[in-house]
Amino acid sequence: MVLMIVSGRSGSGKSVALRALEDMGFYCVDNLPVVLLPELANTLAARNISAAVSIDVRNMPESPEIFEHAMEQLPPSFSPQLLFLDADRNTLIRRYSDTRRLHPLSSKNLSLESAIDEESDLLEPLRSRADLIIDTSEMSVHELAEMLRTRLLGKRERELTMVFESFGFKHGIPIDADYVFDVRFLPNPHWDPKLRPMTGLDKPVASFLDRHTEVHNFIYQTRSYLELWLPMLETNNRSYLTVAIGCTGGKHRSVYVAEQLADYFRSRGKNVQSRHRTLEKRKPS
């Protein structure tokens, strides 16, 4: 059974995550005091039910030791996993402006910007030990729920899920990446007028990149690096490995390379997911 602890900055999507987990059969509790986690787990263990509990600045323990002690008191049948949701500062400010809700730290007479920054500092101990960090800045409510449904399949099977995602450096580096590889030095299909409107998922772009030895060498050396350390990552009690591949715009080279790596590890029987951040932004609504 899984004890999913959901944390993150206010406005990042914790309520959405809890609703999605509830739909997946988790027993969900919002803002349960950390010291009561072992009691909840013991109660649910007899019923063989996984649980999800949200923790934020309102029920954050005074010291990390209190949290660690609670984790040590969990019954052996429960595997604790920590999900941390985040979003960039401007997105959080916009979401608060749209909903006109008060920030949990507003009672301290802080401006919204200061409250967001202080909350980030207070939650850092949880963020630093998170098994999975999801950046919801560009996600809709439905996209976040769908991502959780997809990713938790790997987690609940106790299998490492490899996530290969492409992105454009001009849009920023994904904050949820474990590894970031820069492919801006590879030949760029953008300069071919016929290929410019296409993406790395299209055959003509793939054929263009496939003709270049340096592209093959990069893919080979990157997958060899990941294969070298994958056994240690799999035995390190982690559930996700997010590998981000970046080019200038996130449309051609990074998409192609991410797909090649995903296909390779998928063919080796690994639990693999792929996503393309720039292409997802361009989808018609």
Curated annotation (Swiss-Prot):
The family database entries (Pfam families) matched by this protein are listed as: PapZ_C, RapZ-like_N
Q: Name one GO molecular function term.
A: GTP binding
- Tagged with keyword Ligase: no
Amino-acid positions noted as binding GTP in the UniProt annotation, renumbered to this chain = 56-59
Residues bound to ATP: 8-15
- InterPro entries under this entry? P-loop_NTPase (IPR027417), RapZ-like (IPR005337), RapZ-like_N (IPR053930), RapZ_C (IPR053931)
Key words, A-Z:
ATP-binding, GTP-binding, Nucleotide-binding, RNA-binding
RNA-binding, as annotated region: 266-285
- The answer to whether keyword Lipoprotein applies is no
Which family is annotated? Belongs to the RapZ-like family. RapZ subfamily.
- Provide the assembly information: Homotrimer.
What is the purpose of this protein?
Modulates the synthesis of GlmS, by affecting the processing and stability of the regulatory small RNA GlmZ. When glucosamine-6-phosphate (GlcN6P) concentrations are high in the cell, RapZ binds GlmZ and targets it to cleavage by RNase E. Consequently, GlmZ is inactivated and unable to activate GlmS synthesis. Under low GlcN6P concentrations, RapZ is sequestered and inactivated by an other regulatory small RNA, GlmY, preventing GlmZ degradation and leading to synthesis of GlmS.
Q: What is this protein called?
A: RNase adapter protein RapZ
Species name: Pectobacterium atrosepticum (strain SCRI 1043 / ATCC BAA-672)
